[in-house]
């Protein structure tokens, strides 16, 4: 039977080599300053790790979600925090699978090179939590645009992303036979949105990356930014959410390895009464 770790050894070694360029002091300093590891994320992007899920035709590596979990696991095993950038992995999955040919051609090459970042997803709302079908943010079609009104909360990495995937209801809940119908997803240009109807209020509780409340007041989004079919967004967004859970699980495994390595090293090196702890 093929060994899982051997199969991905090249990826593991490559990620470890890059992470080795950033000391523990670097990450501690960023965390102490409640900053963002910009240099670290840029290095991951330059080496192609952040474009792992982008097809080769668009400048990426064309890898699968399995390989993406290996990348996230190794970042955390090396003492980094992939929470600063993992959003690009699971958001990318949604755009690659359901974006139009025009959307993929327009955005994926620029995301692959790092010219653009897609690290943010706007789903959660103050009164709905994980009951996604009951979101209140609305998108009303008017001509060649959608008008967005509503509120989101716990939306991470807005300050470090150029694009955001936004879930909104395009058909009122009372007008659909199935509550998961009538939801749509859009690709939002964050900078443009902040100048024309989207307000961002940071929540001061996160280390390594900001999370925020978002307020939408008559934000206009071009209809061409609709991803997939109108009303089918619930199915599309699950692709990203499911990938997110898998990636975070891999990160936790990496954390477990890191802590185990640290404890093992400590009990071997720490001496008490002339013996290392492991021999007491």
Question: Could you tell me what each predicted segment is?
Answer:
Residues 62-74, 131-135, 215, 221:
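Structural signature of FAD isoalloxazine-binding scaffolds in flavoprotein oxidoreductases
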Residues 137-140:
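A structural signal for short hydrophobic beta-strand segments in well-ordered beta-sheet cores
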């Amino acid at each position: 039977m093929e060994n899982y770790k051997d199969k991905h050894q090249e990826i593991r070694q490559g990620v470890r080599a890059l992470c080795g360029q950033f000391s523990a002091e670097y990450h501690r300093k960023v965390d102490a300053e409640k900053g963002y590891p910009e240099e670290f994320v840029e290095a991951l992007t330059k080496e192609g790790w952040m474009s792992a899920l982008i097809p080769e035709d668009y400048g990426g590596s064309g890898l699968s979600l399995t390989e993406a979990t290996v990348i996230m696991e190794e970042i955390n095993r090396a003492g980094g925090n992939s929470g600063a950038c993992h959003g690009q992995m699971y958001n990318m999955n949604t755009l690659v699978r359901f974006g139009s040919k025009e959307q993929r051609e327009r955005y994926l090459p620029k995301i692959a090179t790092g010219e653009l970042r897609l690290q943010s997803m706007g789903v959660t709302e103050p009164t709905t939590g994980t009951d996604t079908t009951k979101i209140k943010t609305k998108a009303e079609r008017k001509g060649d645009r959608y008008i967005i009104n509503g509120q989101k909360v716990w939306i991470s990495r807005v300050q470090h992303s150029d694009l955001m995937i936004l879930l909104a209801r395009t058909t009122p809940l009372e007008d659909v036979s199935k509550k998961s119908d009538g939801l749509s997803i859009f690709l939002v240009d964050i900078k443009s949105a902040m100048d024309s109807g989207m307000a961002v209020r940071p929540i001061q509780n996160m280390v390594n990356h900001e999370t925020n409340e978002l307020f939408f007041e008559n934000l206009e989004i071009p209809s061409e930014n609709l991803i997939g079919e109108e009303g089918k967004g619930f199915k599309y967004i699950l692709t990203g959410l499911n990938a997110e859970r898998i990636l975070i699980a891999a990160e936790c495994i990496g954390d477990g390895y890191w802590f185990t390595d640290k404890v093992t090293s400590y009990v071997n090196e720490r001496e008490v009464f002339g013996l290392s702890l492991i021999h007491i």
